[in-house]
Amino acid sequence: MADEEDIQPAEVVELVGRTGMHGEVTQVKVRVLAGENKGRVITRNVFGPVKVGDIIMIKETAREARKLAVR
C-alpha cells in the first residue's frame, strides 16, 4: 500500500485522447503541483470523467503513460 507521501496532486492541463479497448480511459497531460517533481508536465491515463483544470491525485510522479498510437 502506498504511503501518504507518495500521493501527489496534479492539475490537468491538456486532454490528449481516449484509449482502452472501449475508450474508457482518457490520456491527459498533468502538471505536478507538489513533491520532488513539482512543475513537471507528464502524461498519465485517467479513468472516469476529467476536464482541463481538474486536480487529480497521482501515486507515482516518475511514471509516464506511453504515447497513443495512430492506427
From Swiss-Prot:
GO cellular component: cytosolic small ribosomal subunit
One GO molecular-function entry: structural constituent of ribosome
Matching InterPro entries: NA-bd_OB-fold, Ribosomal_eS28, Ribosomal_eS28_CS
Disulfide bridge map: none
GO BP term (any one): ribosomal small subunit assembly
Keywords, in A-Z order: Ribonucleoprotein, Ribosomal protein
Family: Belongs to the eukaryotic ribosomal protein eS28 family.
NCBIfam families: PRK04007.1 (NF003080)
Annotated protein name in UniProt: Small ribosomal subunit protein eS28
Gene giving rise to this polypeptide: rps28e
